[in-house]
Amino acid sequence: MKFTNKKKIIIATGGTGGHIFPAYSLAKNFIKNNYAVEIITDERGLKYLDKHNGIKLNLNNSATIFKKNIVNLFLSVFVIFFSYIKSLVILYKANPSVVFGMGGHASFPVCIAAKTLNIPFIIYENNIQIGRSNKYLLPFAFKIFVSYRDLFGIENKHDHKVVVTGNIIREEILNFKKKIIFQRRH
């Protein structure tokens, strides 16, 4: 893709709170800095995010390949493939300058689609052990933002991609802490 929108960011995230809330906090921060932000997530993620106006949400269900049943594994491969195709369409239309993969199986096909379209993607890992989706995406990622320097599961050959950012904390939590501190002093 030649003509990227320098002020647009796509955030791809799995549907659990551990992925969604850092993604939402990151999105709000980018919006404050005049970036257009879109979030791609699955149905679980939409349950958390549907109340948050101002951010364009894209539904893109995916699946995990870590199934014990061969029939479910086979079905998962098809779901992931169709999620990848949908991701290509979303990214082509949005034309972002970068994609953030926040982990979870819903972010995997989006990041692979970004790589296909030559859009750089950054993965974020806030756990001490790299997640499975992020581990498979690591060789293709532009950078990996981590909360802990000594993250388990990242080979030394990827050290040049690692940026220690710490945990992304929701503004509501920071504001709550300020209120508590202020109340205790007075």
Which residues are covered by each model-predicted region?
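Conserved nucleotide-sugar phosphate-binding/catalytic loop shared by glycosyltransferases and other
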Residues: 6-14, 31-79, 165-169
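Active-site-proximal region of nucleotide-activated glycan assembly enzymes
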Residues: 5-8, 36, 44, 115-179
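Short, well-ordered alpha-helices that flank and scaffold nucleotide-derived cofactor binding pockets
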Residues: 25-28, 32, 112, 116, ...
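An aromatic- and histidine-rich active-site surface loop
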Residues: 44-48, 96-117
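An amphipathic, basic-hydrophobic alpha-helix
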Residues: 69-98, 116
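Short glycine-/acidic-enriched loop or helix-start segments at secondary-structure transitions
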Residues: 20-23, 49-50, 69, 109-112, ...
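Conserved donor-binding/catalytic core segment of Leloir-type glycosyltransferases
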Residues: 185-186
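A short, glycine/small-residue-rich beta-strand->loop->alpha-helix junction that serves as a flexible
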Residues: 11-24
